[in-house]
Design a protein with these regions (language model features):
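N-terminal amphipathic alpha-helix/helix-capping segment at the start of soluble metabolic enzymes
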Residues: 2-24, 71
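Hydrophobic faces of well-ordered beta-strands that scaffold small-molecule active sites
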Residues: 11-16, 48-50, 81-88, 118-119, ...
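Conserved, mostly hydrophobic/aromatic
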Residues: 19, 120, 176, 227, ...
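Terminal or standalone catalytic/regulatory effector modules within metabolic enzymes
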Residues: 41-59, 289, 293-299, 303-483, ...
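Active-site beta->alpha loop and helix N-cap motifs at the rims of alpha/beta catalytic domains
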Residues: 52-144, 148-164, 186
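Catalytic cores of alpha/beta
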Residues: 160-164, 214-226
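Glycine-rich phosphate-binding active-site loops on the catalytic face of alpha/beta enzymes
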Residues: 180, 226-243
């Protein structure tokens, strides 16, 4: 699918995906989306982002929904609008690398079930991790939008991103996304980067940012002046703060100018009324904390994405160590430097953040490592952008050999194994893919479906427990460590929304907290 020549600023609305992922732990239900689809479909958006990211995990883990059924229902309800998803390259929607046969089948099934645009990113900007997803998206007729995971470091500058964009165009990109997940792209750098990209590559430029630091609106405006083709916004009930800038505000700002989006403010207001009731429900249930709507300039200082901030707070609450919050924020950029300056986006944001928490709570840097930190330093996630602190790497992995090839080249085909493991629980190839990404969670879902608890094809949801009903976390003791490891405790806390499955990490947090209480070591 090729784009028509751009003549105005086009809008992708994230209300059905990143808006509630960024603000409300990805807890919007399908039944809350469908009533608004008729008006959304008439809006004239370039696309609606509605799938991928953490929505897949959240559907199965928390909402008792089949994510594939959600996609099919949305496609039926939005016949005139492109549906867009976020795809983590070789990680697909999970937190590890998958073999190419799994990547191909997922691209194929996503497009068959209704996805039009696949935005593909790699946390390390390692293009080797994007090759297969790009190839298979194009093979099955999808619009391929590789993303530049934007960040700031001694190795990430304008020339770096222009070079990366050119390589992605050569690989077959239909458009290029500047993915500013941490709201670090300030207005003037945005203007300059978009200007360069428009001058040096010949595909549309799509800008994704957030409003965590309060600069998102200005960044979008300057990008529009520089000639950006498409921008991401979110309807106001779930816009701004850690989400995207509000759609209505940008539409009103540009109305009557050469950048006029063509969207109708009255229609947007009508759609917003519906999502205001959804936002109210998310607040009542404790998933939408008003804090995520405020401006937080710590992102500019510590380069920590908004969603990562909320995850750090959750982890520190688990360890009864909220007073260490600013110590952890200061430790994050130090860990990032030691790890070779990875951009802080899933899964590296969680990995770096978790290691920073461990370093602070243990009272000693790198006294313990998560297995994911070891994997990053071993090269299992791909090529790190900058120079790694070799002393830290040696402490983490000893004499293990560092992977220098494309990590997926070391993986054998996996689909047949997943099919055999799931057996009769699988009703479709889509079920096999769900199991491949989240085996324990998906299997539990399929068993419930088989037993009639989740009717096949239904999108009935389980209402999450309001925050007021959640038991307060108490200081970690030996007896509580085991309970923290239990699935029930993790699910009730909501900490796993959008996080990689770091079950052993909860135990490490408790151990580190205990060590910190008895240690006099300075951090």
């Amino acid at each position: 699918m090729r784009l028509k020549k751009m003549s105005k600023l086009f809008i992708t609305d994230t209300i059905l995906r990143d808006a509630h992922q960024s603000q409300a732990a990805t807890r919007m239900r399908t039944e809350e989306m469908l009533p608004a689809c008729e008006i959304l479909d008439s809006m004239g958006y370039w696309s609606l982002e509605c799938w991928g990211g953490a929505t897949f995990d959240s559907c199965l883990r928390f909402l008792n929904e089949d994510p594939w059924e959600r996609l099919r229902k949305l496609k039926k309800a939005l016949p005139h609008t492109r549906l867009q998803m976020l795809f983590r390259g070789q990680n697909i929607l999970g937190y590890k690398h998958y073999a190419d046969d799994v990547v191909e089948q997922f691209c194929r099934k996503a497009i068959e079930n209704g996805i039009d645009v696949i935005r593909i990113f790699d946390a390390l900007n390692d293009i080797r991790n994007l090759e297969s997803a790009i190839k298979f998206t194009k093979k099955y007729g999808g619009h391929c939008e590789p993303a530049l995971s934007y960040t700031i470091s001694p190795v990430h500058n304008e020339d770096y991103f222009v070079k990366l964009a050119k390589e992605l165009v050569q690989m077959g990109a239909d458009s290029i996304c500047i993915k500013d997940m941490a709201n670090l792209l300030l207005p003037m750098p945005a203007y300059n980067l978009v200007k360069r990209l428009k001058a040096e590559i010949n595909v549309p430029i799509h800008l994704h940012t957030h409003n965590t630091t309060g600069t998102g609106d200005m960044t979008l405006l300057m990008a529009a002046f520089a000639g950006v083709d498409i921008v991401d916004t979110a309807l106001s009930p779930l816009g701004n703060g850690t989400s995207q800038p509000a759609t209505e505000s940008l539409v009103a700002t540009l109305k009557g100018t050469e950048y006029d989006t063509g969207l109708d403010l009255e229609k947007l207001s009508e759609a917003a009324k519906h999502f205001r009731t959804v936002a109210d429900r998310l607040k009542r249930d404790g998933f939408l904390d008003p804090k995520v709507l405020s401006v937080d300039t710590n992102t500019l200082i510590y380069q920590v994405p908004g969603g990562m901030l909320s995850n750090l707070i959750s982890q520190l609450k688990q360890a009864n160590a909220e007073d260490k919050y600013y110590d952890v924020l200061a430790e994050v950029p130090r860990v990032r430097k030691d790890f070779g300056y990875p951009p802080l986006v899933t899964p590296t944001s969680q990995i770096v953040g978790s290691q920073a928490v461990l370093n602070v709570l243990a009272g000693e840097r790198y006294k313990m490592f998560t297995k994911e930190s070891k994997a990053v330093l071993r090269g299992e996630y791909g090529r790190l952008p900058g120079k790694v602190n070799e002393a830290v790497r040696k402490k983490a992995i000893g004499n293990d050999k560092v992977i220098t090839c494309r990590p997926a080249d070391l993986l054998k085909p996996e689909l047949d194994t997943y099919r055999k493991e799931l057996g009769d629980l699988a009703q479709s190839e889509e079920d096999v893919l769900s199991y491949a990404l989240f085996p324990q969670v998906a299997k539990k879902f399929f068993e419930a479906r088989r037993d009639g608890i989740v009717p096949s094809g239904a999108d009935k949801t389980v209402s999450p427990a309001p925050a007021s009903r959640l038991r307060a976390l108490r200081p970690c003791t030996a007896s509580r460590r085991a309970r923290l490891l239990s699935r029930r405790a993790l699910r009730a806390s909501g900490v796993l929304a959008g996080l990689p499955p770091l079950l052993p990490f909860c135990f490490l947090l408790c151990s580190a907290a205990a060590a910190s209480q008895s240690s006099s070591s300075a951090v």
